[in-house]
Amino acid sequence: MLTDTLTIRHYQKLTDSLVEMWNRGYRYDDLRLFLDGYLAALRHSNSLEPYQIHRLEEETTRYIYDPSNFEMPQPQPQVDYY
């Protein structure tokens, strides 16, 4: 579980970007490459502690491989009563 506010912000940005990329047609391999690049940039910038980056990677990887995060919502069929 993420507790640091800056780490949570990065998590929210990452997951929003991943869903947007999924909706554009990118798939798991592309999402993983995006995540790897994002984490490499965080490591290079030293904006987070290494243990926070590791936690962020674990949580985001778990998010990527949960298929329910990328399902399109299905509208409820309306029943007409006459």
Q: Regions from the language model: what does each represent?
A:
Residues L2-D36:
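N-terminal acidic leader/helix
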Residues L18, L35-L39, I53, T60:
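Generic L/I/V-rich hydrophobic alpha-helical segments across diverse proteins
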Residues R24-R27, L48, N69-F70:
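Intrinsically disordered or highly flexible coil/loop and linker segments, enriched in small
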Residues L39-R43, I64-P67:
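A structural signal for well-ordered alpha-helices, especially hydrophobic packing surfaces
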Residues R43-S45, P73:
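Extended rod-forming repeat segments used as scaffolds/tethers
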